Amino acid sequence: MKKAYGGVVVSPTGQILLREPAGHYKGDVWTFAKGRPEADEAPERTALREVLEETGCRAEILGRIPGSFETSRTVSEYFLMAPLENTARFDGETQAIRWATPDEARRLILLNERPKRRRRDLRVLKRALALFQSLHGSLRA
């Protein structure tokens, strides 16, 4: 299995940053930034780089989201992140970005075509929100 690392960026008010992959790659309509590490790249560095490249958001890591999340060929791990700066520039792998409330994020993730990827992203979202709440108290969104 290949490894990938990504980030769930959550604003101080509990808004979730989602990306719309170009051409809805692999059936993903809205998802989180993630990707494979470059040579000798640490998981945290990979996640920060992928978030910046795919969303244009510079972020800082708040903590590791518990668990690993498997699809057919990849095991992904995610980090909870706080936004630092939005550069408004993202790579060609992304056609749009969007901030969403937790409920909106759930609805957007349900648009993904592949059930396994939908389940993965819903699990990631649930665990990210639980970690966010443990660090910051209840959501104010």
Task: Give residue spans per PLM region.
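A short, structural micro-pattern
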Residues: 1, 72-73, 91
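N-terminal strand-loop-strand
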Residues: 1-32, 63
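Short beta-strand micro-motifs in enzyme catalytic cores
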Residues: 3, 75-79, 96
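Short, well-ordered beta-strand micro-motif
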Residues: 9, 78-82, 101
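Short, charged/polar surface micro-motifs in flexible loops or helix N-caps
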Residues: 13-16, 24-26, 38-39, 57, ...
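Nudix hydrolase/Nudix homology domain
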Residues: 25-29, 91-141
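The catalytic Nudix box helix
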Residues: 32-65
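Active-site segment of metal-dependent pyrophosphate-handling enzymes
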Residues: 52, 56-87
